[in-house]
Design a protein with these regions (language model features):
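Active-site-adjacent mobile loop/cap segments within catalytic or ligand-binding domains
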Residues: 93-181
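Catalytic-core regions of hydrolytic enzymes
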Residues: 1-84, 88, 98-109, 156, ...
Length: 181
């Protein structure tokens, strides 16, 4: 906070569930300049490992990214109208989000690079997907998956506080590089 001279608003500081809609609403209500949503990933493929960083798009980078977004969006069972896929509405949404998407992409690249150094693993890359929490944010926004809880090695690492401290430091370094671009 002090190093970047910025106000940080934590959506939560304990293990309580806050809906995806509410998380974005908190950021929007606080007129946040940047939104970072931090998660742990899971996959039916036990060998899946490493961090991934996402930014919003109605079209996912790949099938796996789309399925992850749909799984995460569904897990909150919030009642909401389905995103309309009408071509004109998609074009208007993309135009309104263009600046945020461009900046989100840059932020995602910086964070992903730092996480790759930390995890010393294959670069899963920066991806795009229609995550609800990102679609509702009115600022540059990224969703960071710090690793796979379904991977035995990473799950073991996630039991240690040092893993989260190191992941947080990597995200901080990426954010710092983005801000000082």
């Amino acid at each position: 906070r002090q190093q970047l001279k910025m106000k940080v608003v934590m959506v939560r500081d304990s293990d309580v569930d806050i809906s995806l809609n509410r998380r974005a609403e908190i950021a929007n209500n606080n007129n946040a300049d940047i939104f970072i949503s931090i998660h742990v990933n899971s996959s039916y493929k036990r060998e899946a490992k490493g961090p991934e960083t996402f930014f919003v798009s109605l079209n996912a980078t790949d099938k796996e990214s789309y399925e992850l977004a749909m799984k995460e969006n569904e897990s909150y069972k919030e009642i909401e109208k389905k995103v309309e896929t009408d071509e004109l509405k998609m074009i208007l949404w993309n135009m309104a989000q263009a600046d945020y998407i461009r900046e989100s992409s840059k932020l995602a690249e910086k964070i992903q690079a730092e996480l790759n150094i930390l995890m010393n693993t294959r670069n899963r890359g920066v991806k795009q997907a229609p995550f609800r929490v990102l679609m509702r944010a009115s600022m540059p926004a990224v969703l960071v998956e710090v690793g796979f809880i379904s991977n035995l090695k990473e799950a073991k690492m996630m039991k240690k506080n040092a893993f989260y401290r190191d992941a947080a430091m990597s995200i901080f370094k990426g954010l710092k590089k983005y801000i000082n671009k």
